[in-house]
């Protein structure tokens, strides 16, 4: 019996452990909607959209910009800006410690990235929220980076696109955070006065001060499929009005049906459809027409 344990069972267990440890972490991903187990490299090919149920998973700001803009001619705006704990705010934890933890987790200095570049040959400037950074909350640096992107659009007369994913204003910055709602709204008013298109893309989720300001001020407002969009969460609203709310009333499909947004576009169609839309809004040739002209020339 002892020989069998030594010669057969123990080596078998050791081989099994070696196999387990050799599987890279994060190679498989479980869809939060249909619970299908998906192979990570294949999921990346579908832009983090479940091939089984079409669930649009949350992705980071840099990943979103990377799949949206052309590869060449990119330049980040306001990358040097860093948040400062001006109020020495503390709840259960110091704000500066929360910032340090979020920066370590995401590799970003704050919750918004702005970048100039091209969309299928059309010059544009893009901002994208990083939800993993303190819930994509809007503080002074988020507001300033957004304004710098808008100013770039004004100076270069190019369209601006913003991908929102946020829980709202950053409570640790108090009034400074709330001021960003006015600041971003004011610069968008300038874009509108100058006739420069601003497209707002609402991704999952968009709430609070962001939904009450810049996210809903687009000339065209686009939602990703089944994105949660609102001001307060469903539970808070139900407790306030003391009524049961309709199923999915904060989903992008419900908002489209009731006229709160203009379009729902799947992630894999965003590049071509927004490029065509912006070409029409700016009077420039569509990417398809530009290719035809180049081919004839």
Curated annotation (Swiss-Prot):
A Pfam match: Zn_ribbon_ACC
Chain sites annotated for binding Zn(2+): 31, 34, 50, 53
InterPro entries, per database record: AcCoA_carboxyl_beta, Acetyl_CoA_COase_Trfase_b_su, ClpP/crotonase-like_dom_sf, COA_CT_N, Znf-ACC
Top-tier EC class: transferase
CoA carboxyltransferase N-terminal domain span: 27-296
Disulfide topology: none
Main location: cytoplasm
Keyword Ion transport: no
Keyword set, alphabetical order: ATP-binding, Cytoplasm, Fatty acid biosynthesis, Fatty acid metabolism, Lipid biosynthesis, Lipid metabolism, Metal-binding, Nucleotide-binding, Transferase, Zinc, Zinc-finger
Cofactor: how and how many bound: Binds 1 zinc ion per subunit.
Subunit structure: Acetyl-CoA carboxylase is a heterohexamer composed of biotin carboxyl carrier protein (AccB), biotin carboxylase (AccC) and two subunits each of ACCase subunit alpha (AccA) and ACCase subunit beta (AccD).
Protein name from the UniProt record: Acetyl-coenzyme A carboxylase carboxyl transferase subunit beta
Source species: Pseudomonas entomophila (strain L48)
Lineage of origin: Bacteria, Pseudomonadati, Pseudomonadota, Gammaproteobacteria, Pseudomonadales
């Amino acid at each position: 019996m002892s020989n069998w344990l030594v010669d057969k069972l123990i080596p078998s267990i050791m081989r099994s452990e070696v196999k387990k440890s050799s599987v890279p972490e994060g190679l498989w991903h479980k869809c939060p909607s249909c619970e299908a187990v998906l192979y990570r490299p294949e999921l990346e090919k579908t832009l983090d959209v479940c091939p089984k149920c079409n669930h649009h998973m949350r992705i980071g700001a840099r990943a979103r910009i990377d799949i949206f803009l052309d590869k060449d001619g990119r330049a980040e705006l306001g990358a040097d800006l860093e948040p400062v704990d001006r109020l020495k705010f503390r709840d259960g934890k110091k704000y500066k410690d929360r910032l340090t933890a979020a920066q370590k987790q995401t590799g970003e200095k704050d919750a918004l990235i702005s970048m100039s570049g091209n969309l299928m040959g059309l010059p544009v400037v893009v901002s994208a929220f990083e939800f993993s950074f303190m819930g994509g909350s809007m503080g002074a640096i988020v507001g300033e980076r957004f304004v710098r992107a808008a100013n770039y659009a004004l100076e270069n007369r190019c369209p601006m696109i913003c991908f929102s994913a946020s829980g709202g204003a950053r409570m640790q910055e108090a009034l400074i955070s709330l001021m960003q709602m006015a600041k971003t709204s004011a610069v968008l008013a300038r874009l509108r006065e100058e006739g420069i298109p601003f497209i707002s893309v609402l991704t999952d989720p968009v709430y609070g001060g962001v939904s009450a300001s810049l996210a809903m001020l687009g000339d065209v407002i686009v939602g990703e499929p089944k994105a949660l969009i609102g001001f307060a969460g469903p539970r808070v609203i139900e407790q306030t009005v003391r009524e049961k709310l309709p199923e999915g009333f904060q989903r992008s499909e419900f908002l489209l049906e009731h006229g709160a947004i203009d379009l729902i576009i799947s992630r894999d169609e965003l590049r071509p459809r927004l490029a065509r839309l912006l070409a029409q809004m700016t009077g420039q040739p569509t990417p398809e027409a530009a290719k035809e002209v180049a081919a004839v020339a």
